[in-house]
C-alpha cells in the first residue's frame, strides 16, 4: 500500500464551475416530475454547498439539522456549517418533509423522504434511490460523462463546496474535517 504522501492528489479543478452549479439549481426547478423538484434541490445543495457524500445525505435525520449547522453521522460525528443558501433550502424543505412523513403510520426520522406518489411516499430515500435520482437529473440537465467516467454529479459538487469553503478563508484542516475529504491534508496539495 502506498504511503499517504504517495497517493495521487485530486486537484480542485474537478470542482463544478459556479455557472454550471447555478444552472443545475435552476434546472432542478424545471425537472419534469414536479414532486421530485424540492428533494432534488436539497440533494444538490447538500452536495454542492455543504460538501457531503451521497451516502451521508441519505443517512441524515431531521434532528441533525441545526439553525446554522448540520450534524453528519459518517465514520465520525462532525458538525458542518450551513451556507445561507443551504439554510434557506432546508427551511423550505422541512414543512414538505413533515407532510411526507404524515403518509406513514409511524413517521421516519430521516431528513430525505420519498415524494413519489404510492405506498412508498414518506419512506426514507435510500442511497441507491439518491444515486438514481441524481443520474436521472444529470441526464435531464444534459451533464455529459467525461472520458470513460459516467456522468457523476456528486464529486464535482463536493469539490465545489470545498472550493467555496477555501475561498471563504477557512483553513484546509477545518475544510478537510467538515467535508471528510482527507486528501486535502496530503503533502503537496495546492488549493
Q: Which role does the model predict for each range below?
A:
Residues 50, 55, 59-91:
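Conserved tyrosine-mediated DNA breakage-rejoining catalytic core shared by Y-recombinases
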Residues 64-67, 170-190:
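Short, polar N-cap/turn motifs at the start of nucleic acid-interacting alpha helices
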Residues 33, 132-181:
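Short, basic (Lys/Arg/His-rich) helix/loop patches that form interaction surfaces
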Residues 1-4, 51-55, 137:
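N-terminal DNA-binding recognition helix of tyrosine site-specific recombinases/integrases
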Residues 1-26, 75, 116-123:
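Flexible interdomain linker/hinge and immediately adjacent N-terminus
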Residues 46-59, 168-170, 179-181:
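A short, glycine-centered helix-capping/turn motif at helix boundaries
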Residues 74-120:
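Basic, alpha-helical nucleic-acid-contacting "clamp/cap" segments
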Residues 20-54, 158:
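Basic, Lys/Arg- and aromatic-enriched nucleic-acid-binding interface segment
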Amino acid at each position: 500500500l502506498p504511503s499517504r504522501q504517495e497517493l495521487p492528489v485530486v486537484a480542485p479543478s474537478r470542482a463544478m464551475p459556479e455557472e454550471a452549479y447555478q444552472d443545475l439549481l435552476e434546472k432542478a426547478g424545471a425537472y419534469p416530475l414536479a414532486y421530485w423538484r424540492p428533494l432534488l434541490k436539497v440533494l444538490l445543495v447538500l452536495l454542492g454547498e455543504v460538501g457531503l457524500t451521497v451516502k451521508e445525505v441519505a443517512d441524515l435525520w431531521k434532528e441533525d439539522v441545526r439553525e446554522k449547522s448540520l450534524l453528519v453521522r459518517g465514520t465520525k460525528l462532525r458538525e458542518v456549517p450551513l451556507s445561507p443558501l443551504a439554510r434557506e433550502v432546508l427551511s423550505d424543505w422541512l414543512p414538505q418533509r413533515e407532510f411526507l412523513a404524515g403518509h406513514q403510520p409511524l413517521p421516519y426520522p430521516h431528513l430525505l423522504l420519498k415524494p413519489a406518489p404510492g405506498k412508498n411516499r414518506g419512506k426514507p430515500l435510500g442511497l441507491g434511490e439518491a444515486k438514481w435520482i441524481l443520474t436521472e437529473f444529470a441526464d435531464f440537465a444534459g451533464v455529459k460523462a467525461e472520458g470513460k467516467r459516467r456522468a457523476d454529479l456528486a464529486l464535482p459538487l463536493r469539490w465545489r463546496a470545498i472550493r467555496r469553503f477555501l475561498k471563504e478563508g477557512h483553513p484546509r484542516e477545518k475544510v478537510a474535517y467538515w467535508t471528510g475529504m482527507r486528501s486535502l491534508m496530503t503533502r503537496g496539495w495546492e488549493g
